[in-house]
Amino acid sequence: LEILEAELEAARLLVYKSAWMMDNKMPNSKEASMGKAKAGRIGNRISLKCVEICSMQGFSEDHLLEKFSRDSKILDIFEGTQQIQQLIVARQVLNKSSADLK
């Protein structure tokens, strides 16, 4: 659980940094994409780990954990898939245009 907590904190800090940059009128597409990708990935991983810990009750529709697990997958792809976010970050890091990297 410590690793999941550390990953969650890392995602939170990426999102905070992106928001701070936006508030200060700084370009933040790379940071926003990293935050979206990290938060989506870790949110999904945490919810699936919780389902695993709770065993059969984690899959029961009588408990909210099943809903959280489904919702985390939707939120993971809502703002663009992981591959799209990774492509945006790669373009920024390598200083390439969308035509250069497809």
Label each residue range with its predicted role:
Residues 1-102:
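Alpha-helical interface subdomain recognition
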